[in-house]
Regions:
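Juxtamembrane amphipathic/hinge helix adjacent to a transmembrane helix
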Residues: 204-221
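Regulatory linker/N-terminal fringe of the SNARE motif in t-SNAREs
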Residues: 1-19, 23, 27, 33-198
């Protein structure tokens, strides 16, 4: 009995640690959004570059936190699979797992939405600078540049024009790199979300199979 008690106490401690890390990730996301607002509203290149570096560092830390939480929830899931539903701790283990999985899913979705909004705003800002370089540019030309930045000869011509155009060109190219980085983060978040939910589906079927096999064995004896 004491072994079961020790086991559930260790499990509850693990749950508390993971829950706190998810909360930390959520706090980071709020700060990342603050950085993004500062970047979009910045009028100083020096300050913007500094804030961008701070944001990138926090994005990296948050990525590591989210991956760690996903991995630790996965381990709990696999442990739960090995416990029969008649175990006295099965209910609380499954309930706590479900709560953590839902909390992490919500944080992943919240973060994905924040990055998606930031990408849209960055594209709007980039489009304004693009039109400084090429005042007659259409939205299609801007979209084409986003898809393939190497295919725009207009920028080679822009280098021969005003200092304003040169500055705008540098701005456009920087925004394009920012957008690619944001897209990468969004893809990572989508992959984490999908993996988390694929694991749940797999686990649910595994539990069903285990219980069906146990019942079949009992009926034969």
């Amino acid at each position: 009995m004491s072994g079961v008690s020790d086991n559930i106490n260790g499990f509850l401690n693990e749950i508390t640690e993971i829950d706190q890390k998810i909360t930390n990730a959520k706090t980071n996301i709020v700060k990342i959004q603050e950085f993004q607002g500062q970047i979009l509203n910045s009028t100083s290149t020096t300050q913007e570059n500094f804030t961008t570096k701070e944001r990138e560092a926090l994005v990296s830390d948050t990525r590591n936190l989210l991956v760690e939480c996903k991995d630790r929830i996965k381990r709990i899931q696999y442990d739960n699979v090995r416990i029969h539903s008649s175990d006295p701790n099965f209910g609380i283990r499954q309930q706590r797992y479900d709560v953590l999985r839902t909390k992490l899913s919500n944080v992943l979705e919240e973060y994905r939405q924040a990055e998606s909004d930031f990408m849209k705003q960055t594209k709007v800002r980039m489009a304004r600078q693009y039109k400084v370089v090429n005042p007659n540019a259409t939205q299609q030309e801007i979209d084409d540049y986003l898809s393939n930045s190497d295919s725009q000869p207009i920028f080679q011509q822009a280098l021969l024009r005003t200092n304003e155009a040169k500055s705008a060109l540098a701005e456009v190219q920087k925004r394009h790199e920012d957008i690619k980085n944001i897209e990468s983060t969004i893809a990572e978040l989508a992959a984490l979300f999908q993996e988390l939910h694929l694991q749940v589906e797999s686990q649910d079927q595994t539990v069903i199979n285990i219980e069906q096999n146990a019942e079949a064995t009992a009926q034969k004896t």
